[in-house]
């Protein structure tokens, strides 16, 4: 009986250690997508080909610096397949776009803590 209890305890520890890393960052990732959708809604008033409902499951998400930097790759325009990347920083619990970061260079130069690749992109 003790062996069974020990096995279950060890299994619980292993499963807890293997939990999905993305859950750790999900609140901040949600903030980033919400901010991006708000910006897209404003931009779509000027250019109606911009998508206004960006979803994480249709995009690529890369988390860096333990959740402080999040780069998302989205299909910005309705009729284009091209992915556009936007870098965000999480400051004081808010997602803010950082226009000083080159997202492609940043992704090449840094190792991601978490990646969620939902759209296949040709790596150059």
Locations of regions flagged by a protein language model:
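Positively charged n-region of N-terminal signal peptides that target proteins for export
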Residues: 1-4, 8-9
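Post-signal peptide N-terminal segment of mature Sec-exported envelope proteins
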Residues: 27-46
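Bacterial signal peptide processing site
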Residues: 18-22
């Amino acid at each position: 009986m003790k062996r069974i209890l020990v096995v279950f305890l060890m299994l619980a520890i292993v499963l807890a250690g293997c939990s999905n890393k993305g859950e750790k960052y999900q609140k901040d990732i949600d903030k980033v997508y919400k901010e991006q959708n708000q910006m897209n809604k404003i931009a779509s008033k000027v250019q109606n080909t911009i998508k206004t409902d960006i979803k994480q499951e249709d995009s690529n998400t890369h988390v860096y610096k333990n959740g402080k930097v999040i780069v998302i790759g989205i299909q910005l325009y309705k009729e284009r397949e091209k992915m556009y990347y936007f870098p965000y920083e999480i400051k004081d619990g808010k997602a803010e776009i950082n226009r000083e970061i080159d997202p492609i260079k940043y992704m090449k130069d840094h190792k991601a803590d978490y990646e969620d690749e939902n759209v296949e992109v040709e790596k150059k």
